[in-house]
Protein backbone atom coordinates (compact mmCIF):
# COMPACT_ATOMS: atom_id res chain seq x y z
CA UNK A 1 0.00 0.00 0.00
CA UNK A 2 1.16 3.53 -0.78
CA UNK A 3 2.48 5.75 2.00
CA UNK A 4 0.32 8.50 0.47
CA UNK A 5 -2.98 6.82 -0.42
CA UNK A 6 -4.80 10.11 -1.08
CA UNK A 7 -2.16 11.70 -3.33
CA UNK A 8 -3.81 10.65 -6.58
CA UNK A 9 -7.39 10.90 -5.32
CA UNK A 10 -9.54 13.81 -6.51
CA UNK A 11 -9.87 16.78 -4.18
CA UNK A 12 -13.14 18.72 -4.03
CA UNK A 13 -12.46 22.37 -3.19
CA UNK A 14 -16.12 23.33 -3.34
CA UNK A 15 -15.79 25.65 -6.33
CA UNK A 16 -13.72 23.19 -8.38
CA UNK A 17 -12.38 19.66 -8.14
CA UNK A 18 -8.72 18.80 -8.66
CA UNK A 19 -8.00 15.50 -10.41
CA UNK A 20 -5.40 14.72 -7.72
CA UNK A 21 -3.48 16.48 -4.95
CA UNK A 22 -0.32 17.23 -6.91
CA UNK A 23 0.39 20.96 -6.85
CA UNK A 24 3.17 22.95 -8.48
CA UNK A 25 4.09 25.82 -6.21
CA UNK A 26 4.81 29.31 -7.45
CA UNK A 27 8.16 30.13 -8.95
CA UNK A 28 9.40 32.96 -11.10
CA UNK A 29 10.73 31.44 -14.32
CA UNK A 30 12.05 34.61 -15.92
CA UNK A 31 9.68 34.00 -18.84
CA UNK A 32 7.02 36.36 -17.52
CA UNK A 33 8.78 39.44 -18.90
CA UNK A 34 10.13 37.82 -22.08
CA UNK A 35 8.73 39.14 -25.39
CA UNK A 36 7.17 35.74 -26.20
CA UNK A 37 6.81 34.85 -22.54
CA UNK A 38 3.13 33.88 -22.69
CA UNK A 39 3.82 31.22 -25.31
CA UNK A 40 6.86 29.93 -23.42
CA UNK A 41 5.01 29.88 -20.10
CA UNK A 42 2.09 28.12 -21.77
CA UNK A 43 4.40 25.36 -23.00
CA UNK A 44 6.19 25.12 -19.63
CA UNK A 45 3.02 24.89 -17.54
CA UNK A 46 1.14 22.71 -20.06
CA UNK A 47 3.91 20.10 -19.88
CA UNK A 48 3.48 19.90 -16.11
CA UNK A 49 -0.31 19.59 -16.43
CA UNK A 50 0.11 16.93 -19.14
CA UNK A 51 2.24 14.85 -16.78
CA UNK A 52 -0.18 14.95 -13.87
CA UNK A 53 0.08 18.21 -11.96
CA UNK A 54 -3.49 19.07 -10.97
CA UNK A 55 -2.96 22.67 -9.83
CA UNK A 56 -0.26 25.08 -10.95
CA UNK A 57 0.38 28.35 -9.11
CA UNK A 58 1.97 30.95 -11.38
CA UNK A 59 4.92 33.13 -10.59
CA UNK A 60 4.02 36.43 -8.97
CA UNK A 61 2.00 38.90 -11.02
CA UNK A 62 1.62 42.45 -9.71
CA UNK A 63 -1.81 44.00 -9.20
CA UNK A 64 -0.46 47.40 -10.30
CA UNK A 65 2.66 48.79 -12.00
CA UNK A 66 3.95 50.01 -8.62
CA UNK A 67 4.26 46.42 -7.43
CA UNK A 68 6.20 44.78 -10.24
CA UNK A 69 9.45 43.05 -9.35
CA UNK A 70 11.33 45.07 -11.96
CA UNK A 71 10.63 47.52 -14.75
CA UNK A 72 8.52 45.75 -17.35
CA UNK A 73 7.51 43.11 -14.80
CA UNK A 74 4.38 41.00 -15.00
CA UNK A 75 1.20 42.89 -14.12
CA UNK A 76 -2.53 42.26 -14.46
CA UNK A 77 -4.52 45.44 -13.97
CA UNK A 78 -6.40 45.95 -17.24
CA UNK A 79 -8.75 43.82 -19.33
CA UNK A 80 -6.51 44.50 -22.34
CA UNK A 81 -3.92 42.18 -20.72
CA UNK A 82 -6.33 39.21 -20.57
CA UNK A 83 -5.44 37.70 -23.98
CA UNK A 84 -1.81 37.39 -22.86
CA UNK A 85 -2.83 35.57 -19.67
CA UNK A 86 -5.42 33.41 -21.46
CA UNK A 87 -2.70 31.86 -23.61
CA UNK A 88 -1.25 30.31 -20.46
CA UNK A 89 -4.59 29.45 -18.86
CA UNK A 90 -5.93 27.78 -22.00
CA UNK A 91 -2.78 25.70 -22.43
CA UNK A 92 -3.05 24.34 -18.88
CA UNK A 93 -6.79 23.71 -19.16
CA UNK A 94 -6.30 21.91 -22.49
CA UNK A 95 -4.02 19.45 -20.68
CA UNK A 96 -6.56 18.84 -17.90
CA UNK A 97 -4.93 21.03 -15.28
CA UNK A 98 -6.04 23.99 -13.21
CA UNK A 99 -4.06 27.17 -12.72
CA UNK A 100 -4.07 29.91 -10.07
CA UNK A 101 -2.48 33.32 -10.46
CA UNK A 102 -0.25 34.38 -7.57
CA UNK A 103 -0.93 38.07 -6.95
CA UNK A 104 2.29 39.61 -5.68
CA UNK A 105 3.05 43.23 -4.83
CA UNK A 106 6.78 43.39 -4.17
CA UNK A 107 6.64 46.59 -2.08
CA UNK A 108 10.06 47.88 -1.03
CA UNK A 109 11.71 44.97 -2.85
CA UNK A 110 10.46 46.16 -6.24
CA UNK A 111 13.58 46.90 -8.24
CA UNK A 112 12.33 49.93 -10.15
CA UNK A 113 12.29 53.65 -9.33
CA UNK A 114 8.51 54.01 -8.77
CA UNK A 115 8.18 51.53 -5.93
CA UNK A 116 5.81 52.02 -3.02
CA UNK A 117 5.60 50.53 0.46
CA UNK A 118 3.92 51.17 3.82
CA UNK A 119 6.91 53.31 4.81
CA UNK A 120 9.83 54.98 3.04
CA UNK A 121 12.37 52.48 4.34
CA UNK A 122 14.77 51.19 1.72
CA UNK A 123 15.19 47.43 1.49
CA UNK A 124 18.75 46.28 2.25
CA UNK A 125 19.02 44.66 -1.20
CA UNK A 126 17.61 47.57 -3.19
CA UNK A 127 19.13 50.86 -4.31
CA UNK A 128 15.68 52.49 -4.54
CA UNK A 129 13.79 54.00 -1.62
CA UNK A 130 10.03 53.50 -1.75
CA UNK A 131 7.39 56.17 -1.59
CA UNK A 132 5.43 55.77 1.66
CA UNK A 133 1.81 55.07 0.85
CA UNK A 134 -0.84 57.46 2.14
CA UNK A 135 -4.13 56.18 3.56
CA UNK A 136 -5.89 56.85 0.24
CA UNK A 137 -3.10 55.12 -1.72
CA UNK A 138 -3.44 52.05 0.51
CA UNK A 139 -7.18 51.96 -0.22
CA UNK A 140 -6.44 52.28 -3.95
CA UNK A 141 -3.94 49.42 -3.73
CA UNK A 142 -6.54 47.24 -2.01
CA UNK A 143 -8.81 47.97 -4.98
CA UNK A 144 -5.94 47.02 -7.32
CA UNK A 145 -5.68 43.61 -5.62
CA UNK A 146 -9.43 43.07 -5.98
CA UNK A 147 -9.35 44.08 -9.65
CA UNK A 148 -6.39 41.81 -10.33
CA UNK A 149 -8.20 38.89 -8.69
CA UNK A 150 -11.33 39.55 -10.76
CA UNK A 151 -9.27 39.75 -13.95
CA UNK A 152 -7.43 36.54 -13.03
CA UNK A 153 -10.77 34.74 -12.80
CA UNK A 154 -11.62 35.99 -16.30
CA UNK A 155 -8.30 34.78 -17.66
Protein language model features and the residues they cover:
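Flavin-dependent oxidoreductase catalytic cores
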Residues: 1-155
